[in-house]
């Protein structure tokens, strides 16, 4: 059919909306209905003009197109997903999960007024930071604490408040870059501090710092290289030695710990990483770390240290630009209180629970999934339970893999790349990985309470796909 004739067959927007209404479409917004119809018609018009569409679309096909577009517009942009990648602190999938206790507190905080900045004892204005400061100090041993909206903000704010217009000395091997092109030298430049690099990429000694100290120096900075490792002929200055030098020269010390952990995980097979408490005990004046990585909480940047130094940071005009809201504080308080008992924290905090779950528990979970799917999918795909390796994620423990189990799918009538693509487009997307000619779902990051949903989605998908 000629293009002009095809274009004349395109439905009218108002008539299409009226038809949708007459068939009982339960959506009150004319704006969304109109946008859905216009999008479908515009897409059809483009196809006709490009020569890709040469036949008139059937009436019932238009109706289906409108409904599909409307459904997609109604779906939330930020949606639930099932993480079968095995990456526990997956930055692209939202980093740390929060527990049901946290979700309950967040719902209460959202639905009712709260004492965010109201002192219940005096009836006067209070400070939002006091809601979690005492708890952070009790857990870390610090004299004072401040919470901002992420660790990059924490680093910037500390440098801006303490070091603007002065020199900060840092090892060349610690000038890290993390996700989103966040580079320590760039942050220092924006904060107004002048960077002084010392040492070599692989080795830095105490005398390197001492030789670089001048009248303009205000701080010795350590940046924990949590997202990469330099191995072989290496050397770095321990926090205790740096603190000793700084005190002798009347300088401040600061550690950007990055992921930041309150629990030593070496008993669970992890390499030794410094905890926040250890750095505070070593006398570091300021320690910054993330809330949504190894801590297992909401996105936040936590600053701890000596009272006099943290108070200077609190008074910075930039503090207000980085302040956290009531939801972050509500979630963080619940997470922090779990740490009063480390065994409780390992069970209640999803991130820690996933990181420390044993292989036997993971194998049982994999078998549960396999039992539900194998018999019904035997003609559609081959299922196997295979050993695999999970990752911590979040820029933590870059060299440490976690032994795990995965359910591996090898389909009979559909390409692996097509499986990955189509599972990603489900209403509840399922994200896995392609490995050794199989589609793998690592069960470490699949929660027990979503096994049923996962199996239902997979059954529906494979039985329809052919």
From Swiss-Prot:
Q: Which SUPFAM superfamilies match?
A: PLP-dependent transferases (SSF53383)
GO CC terms in record: cytoplasm
Residue ranges the record marks as coiled coil: none
Q: Which cofactor does it need?
A: pyridoxal 5'-phosphate
For molecular function, the Gene Ontology terms on record are: L-seryl-tRNA(Sec) selenium transferase activity
**One Pfam family linked to the record:** SelA
Q: Which reaction does it catalyse?
A: L-seryl-tRNA(Sec) + selenophosphate + H(+) = L-selenocysteinyl-tRNA(Sec) + phosphate
- What is the uppermost EC class here? transferase
Q: What keywords are annotated for this sequence in UniProt?
A: Cytoplasm, Protein biosynthesis, Pyridoxal phosphate, Selenium, Transferase
Q: What Enzyme Commission number does this protein have? A: 2.9.1.1
On this chain, the residues bearing N6-(pyridoxal phosphate)lysine are: 293
Please give the pathway this protein is involved in: Aminoacyl-tRNA biosynthesis; selenocysteinyl-tRNA(Sec) biosynthesis; selenocysteinyl-tRNA(Sec) from L-seryl-tRNA(Sec) (bacterial route): step 1/1
Protein biosynthesis: present as a keyword of the record?
Answer: yes
Ribonucleoprotein keyword on record: no
Location in or out of the cell:
Cytoplasm
| Cited Gene3D superfamilies | 3.90.1150.180, Type I PLP-dependent aspartate aminotransferase-like (Major domain)
HAMAP family, from UniProt?
SelA
To which protein family does this belong? Belongs to the SelA family.
This molecule's function is given as: Converts seryl-tRNA(Sec) to selenocysteinyl-tRNA(Sec) required for selenoprotein biosynthesis.
Q: What is this protein called?
A: L-seryl-tRNA(Sec) selenium transferase
């Amino acid at each position: 059919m000629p293009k002009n004739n095809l274009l004349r067959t395109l439905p009218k927007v108002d008539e299409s909306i009226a038809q949708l209404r007459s068939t009982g479409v339960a959506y009150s917004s004319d704006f969304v209905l109109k946008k859905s119809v216009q999008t479908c018609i515009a897409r059809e018009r483009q196809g006709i003009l490009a020569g890709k569409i040469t036949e008139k679309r059937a009436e019932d096909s238009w109706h289906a197109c409108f409904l599909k577009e409307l459904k997609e517009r109604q779906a939330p942009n930020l949606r639930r997903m099932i993480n079968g990648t095995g990456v526990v602190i997956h930055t692209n999938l939202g980093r740390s999960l929060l527990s049901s206790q946290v979700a309950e507190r967040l719902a209460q905080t959202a639905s009712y007024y709260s004492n965010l900045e109201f002192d219940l004892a005096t009836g006067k204005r209070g400070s939002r930071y006091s809601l979690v400061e005492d708890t952070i100090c009790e857990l870390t041993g610090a004299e004072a604490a401040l919470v901002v909206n992420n660790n990059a903000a924490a680093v910037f704010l500390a440098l801006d408040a303490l070091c603007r217009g002065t020199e900060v000395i840092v090892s060349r091997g610690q000038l890290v870059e993390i996700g989103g092109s966040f580079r320590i030298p760039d942050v220092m430049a924006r904060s107004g501090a002048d960077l002084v690099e010392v040492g070599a990429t692989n080795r830095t000694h105490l005398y390197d710092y001492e030789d670089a100290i001048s009248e303009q120096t205000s701080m010795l900075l350590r940046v924990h290289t949590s997202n990469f490792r330099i191995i072989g002929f290496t050397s770095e200055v321990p926090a205790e030695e740096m603190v000793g030098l700084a005190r002798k020269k009347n300088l401040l010390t600061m550690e950007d710990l990055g992921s930041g952990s309150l629990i030593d995980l070496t008993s669970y097979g992890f390499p030794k990483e410094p905890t926040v408490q250890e750095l505070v005990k070593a006398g570091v004046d300021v320690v910054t770390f993330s809330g949504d990585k190894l801590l297992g909480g909401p996105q936040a940047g936590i600053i701890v240290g000596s009272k006099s130094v943290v108070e200077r940071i609190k008074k910075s005009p930039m503090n207000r630009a980085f302040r956290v809201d009531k939801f972050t504080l509500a979630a963080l308080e619940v997470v922090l209180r779990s740490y009063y008992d480390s065994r409780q924290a390992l069970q209640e905090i999803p991130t820690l629970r996933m990181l420390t779950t044993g292989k036997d528990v993971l194998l049982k979970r994999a078998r549960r999934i396999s039992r539900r799917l194998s018999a019904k999918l035997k003609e559609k795909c081959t299922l196997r339970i295979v050993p695999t390796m999970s990752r911590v994620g979040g820029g933590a423990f870059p060299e440490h893999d976690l032994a795990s189990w995965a359910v591996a799918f090898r389909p009979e009538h559909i390409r692996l790349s097509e499986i990955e693509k189509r599972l990603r487009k489900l209403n509840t997307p399922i994200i896995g990985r392609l490995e050794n000619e199989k589609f793998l779902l690592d069960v470490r990051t699949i929660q027990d309470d979503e096994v049923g949903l996962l199996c239902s989605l997979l059954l529906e998908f494979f039985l329809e796909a052919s």
